[in-house]
Amino acid sequence: MAGPDRKPVSSAAATTPAPSAPVVLPKTSESSQLLKIRHSMSHVMAMAVQQLFPKARVTIGPWTESGFYYDFDNPDPFTEADLKAIKKGMIKIINKKVPLERVEVTRAEAETKIKAQNEPYKLEILEGLQDPITLYTLGEDWWDLCAGPHVEHTGQLNAKAFELESVAGAYWRGDETKAQLHRIYGTAWETPEQLAEHKRRKEEALRRDHRRIGKDLDLFSIEDEAGAGLVFWHPRGARMRLLIEEFWRQAHFEGGYELLYTPHVADISLWKTSGHLDFYAESMFGPMEVDEREYQLKPMNCPFHVLTYASKLRSYRELPIRWAELGTVYRYERPGVMHGLMRVRGFTQDDAHVFCLPEQISDEILKILDLTERILSTFDFNTYEINLSTRPEKSIGDDAVWDLATKGLIEALERKGWKYKIDEGGGAFYGPKIDLKIEDAIGRMWQCSTIQLDFNLPERFKLDYVAADGSKQRPIMIHRAIFGSLERFFGIMTENYAGDYPFWLAPEQVRLLPVTDEVQPYAESLLDQLTQAGVRATIDRSGDRLGKLIRTGEQMKIPVLAVIGAKEAEQNAVSLRSRRDGDLGVAAVADLLRAAESANSQRAAGLGLNG
């Protein structure tokens, strides 16, 4: 873990009370016992399903980081009533302490057993397995192709620490042209207390769901008529996006970057040169023909920055060159994987590319780490998980350059003082990289920033610079994204704040609540003053009673509600209610203006006025 100790801004309490003592919820990959429990529970579920639904054919049933699932080919979808019946069947199996045993068989024996059970999907799985073939039996009547591991018997599973959570559609092998299956998701833990904490966190995650908040606060939408995965930013959301972009640009100018704007499409020949058609074609939208030339929407900004570099002769004296762009890219995503702002087909990537000398790598990476911390901490992301991925077996590039690049990344992380894990051999074939995950207010980790060295594109595009001795040399190219996708970051940020955005970022910062018609002119005058001061303010002109005015403002999560009555109008003041700080009492208009301007300039969470 790394990053400052400053705590994330708190938001409204969860609807379900947290336990008095914290309950640790390990991931499956962090606990060998939990892995066995969840893997075994998926088998128990499959056995219970086939006992209740003899026509159901089994496919695969792996563990996940928070539970397990199993995909079934069944004539009908599973209902809520079915899940309850399946759970009862699972409890019976658990209580019987049925043994799970590993058995090695020949391929012919496995094929005979599979055909006897009429399990066509298992037959297909068998074709891809290498000898020896292992089965796990669950009692005498049920078995599955499986490498394990599992618990010794079902009595080691806690019947009070699991739940069947939901049903979803899936395709065999993830291929939409193949059979549609029915997936049952479940979760399993060692103790009932862990299950209760898991449920509480799920409930809290639902409360924070950016899709619901985006609709409630009128921030964005995805319109079916336009197409899946294409985001419409509404005025309130667009205002927030503009604030984020303005801060991003300012931070980059101060960090020594210049900005680029590049096209949304390019001739197909560019994508051939870059290698995208060889390695990324499935994620690209198909070509369009214009004036007898084929064009494709860009899935990445990198080749455009490379062409900009290649547009003129470069000298070593110019390096490092730092270019950044908020570039809209388009990637084909299958219908089943799109999710709100988190997974879309058109999004804005905050791409930057640094072209530098080999000896400049460490300094440039450190500058990127500093800029990353500055930007992420402004949105109250202060705890990071960092992975350094090194050279894989199959790679391109000179050994000395790989060593220099990897040492440069390590040196920068050490100079920054950030802890990191090394993923040996986990880098791309064209260079080592740093991946940074951010932790949100409820402990979830999100992949966010990436720093990637690239020895591939400079070679493909024959990039060079004139060295001090007059020779032509290849520059080092560093890809870098801090937000990654701006849309995805907006979704993560929204869930982190639960829609209670800090004052500087809120789409509507102050709402004026005149309690009578007589004070309306005063409210209009105050609105002008706030607007002139750069404060995003509105007046509620509905004429509702004060209680409803306040409730409406709170539902829209307005940071500051300013109540205006006759007394406030006479005193050139307002009565302030802050979502963050509660009742602030009566404040002079001059004090409100001063506090709001200061909060905006400092990108502060609240007004800083004391009640």
Swiss-Prot record:
Subcellular location: Cytoplasm
Residue ranges of the region described as Catalytic: 209-502
Binding residue positions for Zn(2+): 302, 353, 479
Start-end of Low complexity biased regions: 9-24
The keyword Acyltransferase appears for this protein: no
Entry GO MF terms: ATP binding; metal ion binding; threonine-tRNA ligase activity; tRNA binding
PROSITE patterns in the record: AA_TRNA_LIGASE_II
Keyword Transport among UniProt keywords: no
InterPro entries tied to this protein: aa-tRNA-synt_IIb, aa-tRNA-synth_II, aa-tRNA-synth_II/BPL/LPL, Anticodon-bd, Anticodon-bd_dom_sf, Thr-tRNA-ligase_IIa, Thr/Ala-tRNA-synth_IIc_edit, ThrRS_anticodon
Gene3D superfamilies xref list: 3.30.54.20, Anticodon-binding domain (3.40.50.800), Bira Bifunctional Protein, Domain 2 (3.30.930.10), Threonyl-trna Synthetase, Chain A, domain 2 (3.30.980.10)
UniProt keyword annotations, A-Z: Aminoacyl-tRNA synthetase, ATP-binding, Cytoplasm, Ligase, Metal-binding, Nucleotide-binding, Protein biosynthesis, RNA-binding, tRNA-binding, Zinc
The protein's required cofactors: Zn(2+)
Its EC number(s): 6.1.1.3
Record's cofactor remark: Binds 1 zinc ion per subunit.
Entry's Gene Ontology cellular component terms: cytoplasm
Catalytic activity: tRNA(Thr) + L-threonine + ATP = L-threonyl-tRNA(Thr) + AMP + diphosphate + H(+)
Subunit-level organization: Homodimer.
Cross-referenced HAMAP family: Thr_tRNA_synth
Assigned protein family: Belongs to the class-II aminoacyl-tRNA synthetase family.
Function: Catalyzes the attachment of threonine to tRNA(Thr) in a two-step reaction: L-threonine is first activated by ATP to form Thr-AMP and then transferred to the acceptor end of tRNA(Thr). Also edits incorrectly charged L-seryl-tRNA(Thr).
Protein name according to UniProt: Threonine--tRNA ligase
Protein's organism: Parasynechococcus marenigrum (strain WH8102)
